[in-house]
Amino acid sequence: PARGPIVAAYGQETAKGVSAKGISIKTRSEAQVVSPFDGTVIFAGPFRGYGNIIIIEHGEHYMSLLAGLNSIDCEVGQMLLAGEPIGQMPKSAEAKLYVELREDSRPIDPEAWFAK
């Protein structure tokens, strides 16, 4: 969904002492974020402590959640193709995109899917 190194792995212990349900990717400042797979946007906007997030339903019980965006360039109900631009990261040297992949609402390790 964005270029950059993974700086926090799935299952890695967070600062709060819990296992991460997704991965964090360090991106360049103002990097473009794209849809990881084909799907339909089911949520796009600010959410609790996550800032701007996008949730995409991919079918067959899979969905992805992307958080940490500065701006969102898609809307609820929009159908997306893999690689289609959906948002932009903040203007910051420390920009990090948080990505979760879920199957039947359970988090799964997204790294193997993104390597395909």
Cite the ranges covered by each PLM segment.
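Short beta-alpha junctions and helix-cap segments that line functional grooves
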Residues: 20-21, 68-69, 85, 96
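Short, acidic/hydrophobic/Gly-rich beta-strand patch recurrent on exposed beta strands
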Residues: 23-26, 53-58, 98-101
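Short alpha-helix capping/helix-loop boundary micro-motifs
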Residues: 26-27, 66, 71-74
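Zn2+-dependent peptidoglycan hydrolase active-site motif and core
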Residues: 35-70
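Conserved, short, structured surface segments that act as functional micro-motifs
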Residues: 76-116
